[in-house]
């Protein structure tokens, strides 16, 4: 039996408009707002008072307040960035004994607009903090424990008009001209992406579009230094799956008619597509079972399929 008590957990980058939307939800559902920014200012006197010690104190108290209100039968809006999977799981575990409908709300605003709007705020966040969250973004998924998903698009249609494969490929600065400069990739990013999409069309055509944009994060993560900070003659794309998952959100919104659940599913497919490149990822049955439990059977199979198409495209 579904509980009448609703929990709205917002997920979004700083300056994406979470707090504004939290107020709308609060009015619509007569919900209590619990904001990490507001509590940080209450406890430490500064929204930018960020440290591990402060965060431990902050989120322990925040979780307690959310849980108390839910137990008292109040609808709650939990307003924090929540872009990290581990933090979302810790929160859900903390409130696991409370009956409520858990709704995960992805607040969508392109990264460059987050940076612009951040500068217009009275209390801004350091730009490097937003960049770090963007480059480590982890999309939520059903197996975390959510009952439903929704997406709140906090911009005009014109703001995401350029998020289309017709623009991504077919202009002078598009990915057809993006040279990957890596020993692992001799093709341009555009050609490689088309090859993966063609292979996916033959294997599972409903994933063709996702295959076409699976590496879109590489545009924003290209670096000539390796993980040790040394130039080694190759370009590297650390975290391109995280950035790609975030950027893909706007391509799906603009180019497809997918509902929120489907968009988030495909974002996860892009986020996880690199897992099978990790050494030993499937060398024991227990590792495979853990990953299937984390993703679900269907997403697991689709991740393996996308990775297979990605590998085969390298070999063509």
Q: Where does each model-flagged region fall?
A:
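Hydrophobic anchor at the beta1->P-loop junction of P-loop NTPases
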Residues: 10
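The conserved Walker
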Residues: 13-14
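Conserved glycine(s) of the Walker
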Residues: 17
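Conserved substrate/cofactor phosphate-moiety recognition/catalytic segment
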Residues: 20-74
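Glycine-rich phosphate-binding loop used to anchor ATP phosphates in small-molecule kinases
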Residues: 54-102
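Acidic/His-rich, divalent-metal-binding segments that scaffold phosphate/diphosphate chemistry
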Residues: 152-233
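Divalent metal-dependent catalytic cores for phosphoryl transfer on phosphate-bearing substrates
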Residues: 196-314
């Amino acid at each position: 039996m579904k509980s009448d008590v609703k929990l709205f957990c917002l997920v979004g980058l700083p300056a994406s408009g979470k707090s504004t939307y939290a107020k709308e939800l609060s009015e619509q559902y007569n919900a209590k707002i619990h904001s990490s920014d507001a509590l940080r200012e209450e406890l430490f006197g500064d929204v930018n008072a960020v440290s591990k010690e402060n965060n431990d104190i902050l989120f322990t108290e925040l979780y307690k307040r959310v849980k108390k209100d839910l137990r008292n039968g109040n609808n709650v809006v939990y307003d924090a960035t929540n872009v990290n999977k581990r933090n979302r799981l810790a929160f859900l575990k903390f409130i696991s004994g409370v009956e409520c409908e858990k709704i995960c709300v992805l607040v969508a605003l392109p990264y460059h607009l987050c940076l612009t709007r951040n500068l217009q705020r009275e209390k801004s966040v350091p730009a490097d903090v937003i960049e770090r969250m963007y480059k480590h973004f982890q999309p939520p998924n059903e197996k975390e424990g959510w009952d439903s998903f929704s997406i709140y698009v906090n911009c005009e249609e014109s703001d995401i008009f350029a998020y289309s494969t017709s623009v991504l490929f077919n202009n002078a600065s598009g990915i057809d001209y993006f040279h990957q400069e890596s020993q692992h990739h001799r093709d341009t990013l555009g050609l490689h992406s088309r090859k993966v999409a063609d292979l996916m069309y033959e294997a599972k055509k409903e994933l063709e579009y996702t295959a076409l944009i699976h590496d879109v994060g590489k545009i924003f993560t290209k670096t000539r230094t390796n993980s040790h900070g040394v130039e080694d003659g190759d370009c590297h794309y650390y975290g391109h799956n995280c950035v790609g998952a975030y950027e893909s959100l706007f391509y799906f919104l603009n180019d497809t008619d997918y509902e929120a659940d489907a968009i988030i599913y495909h974002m996860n497919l892009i986020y996880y597509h690199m897992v099978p490149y990790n050494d030993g990822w499937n060398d024991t049955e227990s590792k495979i079972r853990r990953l299937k439990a984390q993703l679900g059977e269907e997403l697991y199979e689709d991740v393996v399929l996308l990775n297979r198409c990605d590998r085969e495209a390298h070999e063509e």
